[in-house]
UniProtKB/Swiss-Prot annotation:
Family from the record: Belongs to the universal ribosomal protein uS3 family.
Gene: rps3
Taxonomy of the source species: Archaea, Methanobacteriati, Methanobacteriota, Thermococci, Thermococcales
Role played: Binds the lower part of the 30S subunit head.
Gene Ontology terms describing biological process: translation
Pfam families with a match to the protein in the record: KH_2, Ribosomal_S3_C
Top-rank lineage group of the source organism: Archaea
Cellular component GO terms held in the UniProt record: cytosolic small ribosomal subunit
Name of the protein in question: Small ribosomal subunit protein uS3
One of the record's GO molecular function terms: rRNA binding
Keyword field contains Iron: no
Length: 209
C-alpha cells in the first residue's frame, strides 16, 4: 500500500505541475512535461513551441521556474531542459491549450474546433478527435465530439501512437474541458477505417467520461 500511495502522490504532483506550467507558459506553446528521477535529483523536460520564451531573457524565467518546482512542488534539485516542438500542430497538448484560448477569446466552439481540425490535418495528421465538455451554448452541460481521419481508440496503438492533450477554458458560463487526440503522419496500422470529412456529434453522458 505504501508503494501505491507513493505513485498516486507522484502522479498527482505531476498533474499539478503540468497545470501550473500550462498557465505560466501558454504563450510559449506549452506542450507538456516529462519528469524523471535521476541520481542527481529530478530531470524535468518541458516541451514547447517557443523554447526561448521558457528560458527567458538571460535565463531569468527558467531560473524562476526551477525555484518554484523545488520550493512549491517539492521536487528534489530540479534540472530543467527545454525541448522544442518541431510541429506544434501535431502536439495534442499545444492544440488543446490553443483551442481553450480561442474559446476564452469568444470564438464560437464549433468554429474553433473546425478551424483546429483543418489546421491539424493540413499539417499531415492521419486523424484527429476533439471533445468539448461543459456549458457550450446554455445552462445545460453537454459534450460534443468532432473528428476526421483515422484514430486508434483502443489497445497498445492508442497508448503509444496517439498524442493526447487536455486543457480548460474559463468562460462566463463555467469551465469547458478540451480534449484533443492526434494520430501522427508516420503511424501505420492494419484494418483502418478513415473518415474523410469532419464529423460532429453530441455525446451522451456516459460516453463523455
Amino acid at each position: 500500500m505504501a508503494i501505491e500511495r507513493y505513485f498516486i502522490k507522484e502522479g498527482v504532483k505531476e498533474m499539478l505541475i503540468d497545470e501550473y506550467l500550462e498557465k505560466e507558459l501558454r504563450r510559449a506553446g506549452y506542450g507538456g512535461i516529462d519528469i524523471k528521477k535521476t541520481p542527481l535529483g529530478t530531470k524535468v523536460i518541458i516541451f514547447a513551441a517557443s523554447p526561448g520564451y521558457v528560458i527567458g531573457r538571460g535565463g531569468r524565467r527558467i531560473r524562476e521556474l526551477t525555484r518554484i518546482l523545488e520550493r512549491q512542488f517539492g521536487l528534489e534539485n530540479p534540472q530543467i531542459e527545454v525541448e522544442e516542438i518541431k510541429n506544434p500542430y501535431l502536439n495534442a497538448k499545444v492544440q488543446a491549450v490553443r483551442l481553450a484560448q480561442a474559446l476564452e477569446r469568444g470564438i464560437h466552439f464549433r468554429r474553433a474546433a473546425y478551424s483546429a481540425i483543418r489546421a491539424i490535418m493540413r499539417n499531415g495528421a492521419r486523424g484527429v478527435e476533439i471533445r468539448l465538455s461543459g456549458k457550450l451554448t446554455g445552462e445545460r452541460a453537454k459534450s460534443v465530439r468532432f473528428y476526421q481521419g483515422y484514430l486508434a481508440k483502443v489497445g497498445n496503438p492508442a497508448e503509444t501512437l496517439v498524442s493526447k492533450g487536455y486543457a480548460q477554458a474559463l468562460l462566463k458560463l463555467g469551465v469547458i474541458g478540451v480534449k484533443v487526440a492526434i494520430m501522427p503522419p508516420d503511424a501505420r496500422l492494419p484494418d483502418e477505417i478513415e473518415v474523410k470529412e469532419i464529423v460532429e456529434e453530441e455525446v451522451s453522458g456516459n460516453e463523455a467520461q
